[in-house]
């Protein structure tokens, strides 16, 4: 565990999660600013969030895995894909990055366009229970897309994971904005809420819904649909950060990284 934390690759990965979440929040929230001359459309916001996540997954995915979302990180922990310590540092970096991204946007946005900085809120008389279920479903489909499109065990061509994930985020926003402003990402909701000091009684929805949805997707994918053939000791080693995969696994992982491009050969 200590060896993992002290490695340069680990530090780079944590920084990549911080930077990616900062950029994601800046562009995503920026697309939702209410300019007096032109109010944002649902399609505009959905495309901005989707393009941002696709771009960042393409650019920084090979460094950290491109989680950019505490719900996805926790789901991968439950799915036995990352260590507990890595999950902790990733989530911390994502939350700090989200605050930084929202803070920068707050600083550069004119007062008449800033509004509430796109803080997530319940819309159209949606109840907290309804909102939680919506966020759960939206994040469930996103997590399934991420797990399937980045699974190193798949031998058939899967196209571009970055493009697939970006489209999944766009899809979620096209539906979710009407209910909750669409979170699917606790960091996306937490950042502007901190900067604006605006935590509504329903803020928990944007944590519980996405996390439960992503964790359910991890259980379904990694334990029921496509379970790993790992022993109990190997699973414990992964959680502790002491697991050392064999050379064949590493070769498959490197080959998988080559598919993180916008076109396939």
From Swiss-Prot:
Detected in skin eccrine sweat glands, at the apical cell membrane and at intercellular canaliculi (at protein level). GO terms for cellular component: apical plasma membrane; basal plasma membrane; cytoplasmic vesicle membrane; endoplasmic reticulum; extracellular exosome; microvillus; plasma membrane. Residues 66-74, 181-191 dip into the membrane without crossing it. Residues 1-12, 61-65, 75-87, 148-158, 225-265 are cytoplasmic. Glycans are attached at residues 124-125. A motif (NPA 1) lies at residues 69-71. InterPro entries: Aquaporin-like, Aquaporin_5, Aquaporin_transptr, MIP, MIP_CS. The chain crosses the membrane at residues 13-33, 40-60, 88-108, 127-147, 159-179, 204-224. This is Aquaporin-5. SUPFAM superfamilies: Aquaporin-like. Changing residue 188 to C: In PPKB; no effect on localization to plasma membrane. Changing residue 38 to E: In PPKB; no effect on localization to plasma membrane. Belongs to the MIP/aquaporin (TC 1.A.8) family. Homotetramer; each monomer provides an independent water pore. Interacts with TRPV4; the interaction is probably indirect and regulates TRPV4 activation by hypotonicity. It comes from the Eukaryota. It is found in: Apical cell membrane; Cell membrane; Cytoplasmic vesicle membrane. Aquaporins form homotetrameric transmembrane channels, with each monomer independently mediating water transport across the plasma membrane along its osmotic gradient. Plays an important role in fluid secretion in salivary glands. Required for TRPV4 activation by hypotonicity. Together with TRPV4, controls regulatory volume decrease in salivary epithelial cells. Seems to play a redundant role in water transport in the eye, lung and in sweat glands. GO terms for molecular function: identical protein binding; water channel activity. It catalyses: H2O(in) = H2O(out). The keyword Chaperone does not apply. A motif (NPA 2) lies at residues 185-187. Keywords: Cell membrane, Cytoplasmic vesicle, Disease variant, Glycoprotein, Membrane, Palmoplantar keratoderma, Repeat, Transmembrane, Transmembrane helix, Transport. Residues 34-39, 109-126, 180, 192-203 are extracellular.
């Amino acid at each position: 565990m200590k060896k993992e934390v002290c490695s340069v690759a680990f530090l780079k990965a944590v920084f990549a999660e911080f930077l990616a979440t900062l950029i994601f929040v800046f562009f995503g929230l920026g697309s939702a600013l209410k300019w007096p001359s032109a109010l944002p459309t649902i399609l505009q916001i959905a495309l901005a969030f989707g393009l941002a996540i696709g771009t960042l997954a393409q650019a920084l995915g090979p460094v950290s895995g491109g989680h950019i979302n505490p719900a996805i990180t926790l789901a991968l922990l439950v799915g036995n894909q990352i260590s507990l310590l890595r999950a902790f540092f990733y989530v911390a970096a994502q939350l700090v990055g989200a605050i930084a991204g929202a803070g920068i946007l707050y600083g550069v946005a004119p007062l008449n366009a800033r509004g509430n900085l796109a803080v997530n809120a319940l819309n159209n008389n949606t109840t907290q229970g309804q909102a939680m279920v919506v966020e759960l479903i939206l994040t469930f489909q996103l997590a399934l897309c991420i797990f399937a499109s980045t699974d190193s065990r798949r031998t058939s061509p899967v196209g571009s994971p970055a493009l697939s994930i970006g489209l999944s985020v766009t899809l979620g926003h096209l539906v979710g904005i009407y209910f909750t402003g669409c979170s699917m990402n606790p960091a996306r909701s937490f950042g502007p809420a901190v900067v604006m000091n605006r935590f509504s009684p329903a803020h928990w929805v944007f944590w519980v819904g996405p996390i439960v949805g992503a964790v359910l997707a991890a259980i379904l994918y990694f334990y029921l649909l496509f379970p790993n053939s790992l022993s109990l000791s190997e699973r414990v080693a992964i959680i502790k950060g002491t697991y050392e995969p064999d050379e064949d696994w590493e070769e498959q992982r490197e080959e998988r990284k080559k598919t993180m491009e916008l076109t396939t050969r």
